[in-house]
């Protein structure tokens, strides 16, 4: 049997250890709630049993690293960022855990020429710094993994923070929600462009099986994100793991807003994972969305669970 491994992405939803708060002084888990959140997260790791997993919304890295270590995910990396001093935390990071050695880590740096070409303000900053890592997967190859959490669709500023029209009420009810969300969409699209160019340059310099995974806060078919899968050159194309899977079921939502489901969490794979590519090294057997907690609401559990479904791709080596 050929070697196999799995890759997952998991938005944890405000993983912050008390007495720290997330975004507001009232958002603090008590000891029982925090234990339940850790237990729920641990149980998902046990169920999925990923070999490589990227996380989003990490405020408290040490307890998450300990949960991963207990499940054999002993190799760990956290996106760089300045440590917040206030007890109210507002800057979550992404992280990576693996059963396989992490050879090196780096950040995705915005390309100055692309920033200029897109007419963006300089210096350009990601809303949440992506994490780039090189891992060694025994029996396969080194693999490049980029963990992302792109800008959310929420308005980029609060009502009254940036008045754009003279009518204050109209500004807050209409201008801010519409134009603020548009600003967020532009930021998200710019982040996708920076990722696309960074990976192209990496593949040109050092071609490796590569993965971009995480919470993209949007559908890959949207005009803003479709460029991540763009390019006519097969060697530089990324494809959704679900589209590459040999066993394809229905495309399950990974997030719900009310009764409306969306696929926001994705695993994008380079051509080496495409069984139809001439130089393919691996194939995607199946993609699983772990969404039971979203489909069967439990009001008591909801705050301790995640508002996203983890996504896992099972991969078989073909060499």
Language-model region placement:
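N-terminal, active-site-proximal structural segment of metallo-dependent hydrolase catalytic domains
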Residues: 1-75, 80-93, 169-172, 192-196, ...
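A long, amphipathic alpha-helix that forms part
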Residues: 178-206
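Hydrophobic pocket-lining residues within nucleotide cofactor-binding pockets
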Residues: 12-15, 58, 102, 150, ...
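Active-site-proximal beta-strand elements of phosphoester/diester hydrolases
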Residues: 4-17, 142-151, 173-181
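Structured beta-strand-rich core segments of catalytic domains in phosphoester-bond hydrolases
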Residues: 54, 58-155
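Short, solvent-exposed loop/turn elements at domain surfaces
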Residues: 15-20, 154-156, 276-277
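Metal-dependent phosphoester-hydrolase catalytic domains
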Residues: 1, 106-107, 119, 124-127, ...
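Charged, glycine/proline-rich intrinsically disordered loops and linkers
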Residues: 159-179
């Amino acid at each position: 049997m050929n070697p196999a491994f799995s890759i997952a992405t998991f938005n944890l939803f405000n993983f912050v250890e008390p007495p720290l708060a997330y975004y507001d002084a009232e958002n603090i888990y008590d000891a029982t709630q925090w234990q339940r959140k850790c237990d729920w997260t641990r149980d998902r790791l046990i169920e999925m049993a990923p070999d490589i997993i990227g996380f989003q919304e990490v405020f408290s890295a040490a307890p998450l690293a300990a949960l991963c270590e207990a499940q054999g995910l002993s190799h760990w990396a956290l996106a760089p960022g300045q440590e917040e001093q206030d007890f109210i935390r507002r800057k979550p990071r992404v992280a990576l855990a693996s059963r396989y050695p992490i050879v090196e880590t780096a950040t995705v740096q915005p390309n100055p020429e692309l920033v200029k070409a897109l007419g963006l303000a300089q210096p350009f900053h990601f809303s949440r710094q992506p994490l780039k890592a090189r891992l060694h997967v025994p029996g396969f190859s080194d693999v490049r993994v980029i963990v992302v959490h792109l800008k959310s669709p929420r308005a980029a500023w609060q009502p009254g923070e940036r008045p754009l029209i003279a009518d204050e009420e109209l500004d807050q009810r209409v201008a801010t929600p519409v134009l603020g969300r548009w600003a967020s969409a532009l930021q998200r699209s710019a982040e996708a462009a920076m990722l696309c160019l960074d990976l192209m340059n990496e593949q040109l310099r050092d071609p490796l099986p590569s993965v971009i995974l995480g919470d993209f806060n949007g559908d890959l078919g949207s005009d803003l994100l479709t460029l991540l899968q763009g390019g006519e050159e097969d060697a530089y194309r990324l494809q959704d793991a679900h589209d590459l899977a040999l066993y394809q079921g229905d495309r399950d939502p990974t997030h719900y807003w009310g009764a409306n489901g969306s696929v926001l969490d994705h695993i994008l794979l380079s051509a080496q994972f495409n069984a139809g590519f001439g130089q393919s090294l691996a194939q995607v057997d199946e993609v699983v969305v772990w969404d039971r907690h979203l489909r069967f609401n439990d009001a008591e559990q909801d705050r301790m669970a995640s508002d996203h479904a983890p996504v896992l791709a099972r991969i078989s080596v073909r060499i």
